[in-house]
């Protein structure tokens, strides 16, 4: 199962971290599992999320055209576009 790394900036790190359960559920809706959050060591507002993904096409689709629920969670968590996804090969 390939691993995906998603990076982007956020408005507020603490606000973003509080949304862990919702974020994991959103990523799991795109066939992700083992969701892990990372914050930048330099104290910036850049973050990364990793997940194991069983269907890479479904994950890409979810990231490119998020459902209203996923989009709402992103807005609530202060996600700042653009998001970049890296896929393990």
Give the residues covered by each predicted segment.
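Short S/T/G/P-rich N-terminal loop/turn motif that feeds into the first structured element of a domain
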Residues: 1-89
């Amino acid at each position: 199962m390939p691993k995906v790394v998603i990076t982007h900036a956020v408005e507020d790190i603490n606000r973003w971290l509080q949304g862990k359960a919702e974020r994991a559920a959103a990523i799991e809706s795109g066939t992700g599992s083992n969701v892990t959050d990372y914050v930048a060591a330099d104290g910036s507002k850049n973050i990364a999320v990793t997940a194991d993904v069983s269907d890479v096409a479904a994950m890409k689709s979810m990231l490119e055209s998020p459902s209203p629920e996923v989009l709402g969670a992103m807005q609530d968590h202060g996600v700042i576009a653009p998001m970049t996804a890296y896929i393990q090969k």
